[in-house]
Amino acid sequence: MGEIIKGKPVADKISEDLIQEIEGLKGKGIQPKLAIVRVGANSSDLAYEKGALGRSKKVGVETEVHELPEDITQDDFIKELKKLNEDKAVNGILIFRPLPEQLDESVIKYVIAPEKDIDCLSPINVGKMTEGDKTGFPPCTPTAVVEILKFYGVELQGKDCAIIGASMVVGKPAALLLLNENATISVCHIFTKDSAKIASQADVVVVGVGVPRLVKENWIANGAVVIDVGINVDKEGNMCGDVDFDGVKDKVSMITPVPGGVGSVTTSILAKHVVKACKQQNNL
C-alpha cells in the first residue's frame, strides 16, 4: 500500500513558522488581520469559515467576518468591499465564492485591492501567478497542493503531471504553479478525449473536479503520487474524494486522504498569505 500523506503535518509546520513570524511583527507593533466577506449563510462557506477562523486564531492573525444579506445589491456589495480596501488595519480580504447571481464577479474582481486579494480573485494576481511573480497571491487550494508535494519530498522538476479538472479554483492555477516548478503539465477537462490514458502516464496526478471517485485504478500508473482535492458526499452519506481511494491505494507511492488531506493545508496557506500581505504593505 502507498504512503497516505496527510495534510496535518504540513499545516502544523506552516503554523509553527507563522507563529514565530507574527510574534516578530507584533514586536514591531504590527498585527496581521484578515477580513472574511460572506454573502448569506451557505453551509460550505460556513464550514470553511470555521476552519479559517480557527487556524487564524491559532497562529495569531486577527479576523473579522462581514456577513452580508443574500439579496445585497451589487452597488452595496462594492461599497462594503471598498471600505475594506481602504481600511489600513485590514491586510487580507477573502470573498467566499461563488457569489449570488445578482453580484457580477467579472466586475467585483477589478474592485478588490490586489495587495489584499489573498485568494487570487483579482486579474492582477492571476497575471502574477502566470509570470511566476512571487509578490502575488495564487489561490490557496492549489498552493496547498504544491506545499504538500514539497513537504513530502516529491521531486517536481522534469516530472510529468496530469491535472484532472480545469477550473480557475483548482485546475488552471495548479497547472501554472506546477509549471513554475519546472514540471511538464497535461490538463484534462470535460472535452479531453482520453483523460484516463493521459493520467496513467503521469508521475503526479492532481484531481479537482467534484465528481465522487471518478478516478479509478486504471487512471493511475504504478508508483504515481496522487493529490485528491475533491470533497464530496456519496450516496451513502460518506465523505469521499474525486479518487477511488480504495481502488488505487495499493498502486500509488503516495496519496492524500479525504478528509484529512488538502483541506487542512488550505487554511494554513490562507493565514500565510495574510502575513505575506501584511509584510508587503509594511514594506518588510
From Swiss-Prot:
CDD domains, alphabetized: NAD_bind_m-THF_DH_Cyclohyd
InterPro entries the record matches: Aminoacid_DH-like_N_sf (IPR046346), NAD(P)-bd_dom_sf (IPR036291), THF_DH/CycHdrlase (IPR000672), THF_DH/CycHdrlase_cat_dom (IPR020630), THF_DH/CycHdrlase_NAD-bd_dom (IPR020631)
Pathway: One-carbon metabolism; tetrahydrofolate interconversion
Positions with a binding annotation for NADP(+): G165, A166, S167, I190, I231
Database matches in SUPFAM superfamilies: Aminoacid dehydrogenase-like, N-terminal domain (SSF53223), NAD(P)-binding Rossmann-fold domains (SSF51735)
Catalytic activity: (6R)-5,10-methylene-5,6,7,8-tetrahydrofolate + NADP(+) = (6R)-5,10-methenyltetrahydrofolate + NADPH; (6R)-5,10-methenyltetrahydrofolate + H2O = (6R)-10-formyltetrahydrofolate + H(+)
GO (cellular component) term, any one: cytosol
Known EC number: 1.5.1.5, 3.5.4.9
Alphabetical keyword list: Amino-acid biosynthesis, Histidine biosynthesis, Hydrolase, Methionine biosynthesis, Multifunctional enzyme, NADP, One-carbon metabolism, Oxidoreductase, Purine biosynthesis
Keyword field contains Oxidoreductase: yes
Keyword NADP: yes
Pfam family, one: THF_DHG_CYH_C
Alphabetized GO MF terms: methenyltetrahydrofolate cyclohydrolase activity; methylenetetrahydrofolate dehydrogenase (NADP+) activity
Subunit structure: Homodimer.
Role, per record: Catalyzes the oxidation of 5,10-methylenetetrahydrofolate to 5,10-methenyltetrahydrofolate and then the hydrolysis of 5,10-methenyltetrahydrofolate to 10-formyltetrahydrofolate.
Protein family (similarity comment): Belongs to the tetrahydrofolate dehydrogenase/cyclohydrolase family.
HAMAP family: THF_DHG_CYH
Protein name: Bifunctional protein FolD
Organism for this UniProt entry: Alkaliphilus metalliredigens (strain QYMF)
Encoding gene per record: folD
